[in-house]
A protein has these predicted regions:
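Acidic, metal-coordinating helix/loop segments flanking the phosphotransfer/catalytic sites
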Residues: 49-65, 73
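C-terminal output helix
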Residues: 124-133
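Non-catalytic signal-transmission and effector/linker regions of two-component phosphorelay proteins
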Residues: 1-37, 132-154
């Protein structure tokens, strides 16, 4: 390459085999399902059932994806779970996925106003969860690619 010419950065991005994500869910059964879906799409999930532990991990861990699995609106501590999602947006720059319990339109509106990257209107089973984890992996890769390209031109 002739001297004085800058080479544009490569558009090839190599991601680690397992990306890390943080998950908050309300039951052991859901935790197992979410862990499986994440693993099947190359995510290494740190799954929390306790909201305080989750918020501590949001603060301590820098992960590109955070998944908040909300309980039923009728559950007495539902607002605590919503608050956890809001704090996640305040404390991190990760993509936030909100999974609702039963497709409540007000819940979806709240998630959209929060700035959630994606909202799932209820239990989509393993295949639906794998789809969202796969899409998130692509979004994180694209975000990283943009950062790599911008850094290459400095």
């Amino acid at each position: 390459m002739p001297e004085g010419k800058l080479e544009a950065p490569s558009r090839t991005l190599v991601l680690p085999d397992l990306l890390r994500c943080l998950v908050l869910t309300w039951s052991e059964g859901r935790a197992d399902l979410l862990r499986s879906a994440a693993r099947n799409e190359s995510w290494q999930a740190t799954v929390n059932i306790d909201v305080r532990e989750f918020l501590r991990n949001v603060f301590l861990l820098r992960v590109p994806l955070t998944f908040v699995d909300l309980p039923s609106v009728q559950q007495h501590d539902y607002s605590i779970w919503q608050n956890a999602a809001e704090r996640t947006k305040d404390l991190s720059d990760s993509l936030v996925v909100v999974c609702g319990f039963g497709g409540d339109p007000l819940e979806e509106l709240w998630a959209r106003q929060l700035g959630a990257w994606a909202y799932l209107p209820g239990d989509n089973g393993l295949a639906g969860l794998e789809l969202i984890f796969g899409d998130a992996r692509k979004a994180v890769a694209n975000k990283a690619l943009v950062c790599v390209e911008l850094d290459g031109y400095r």
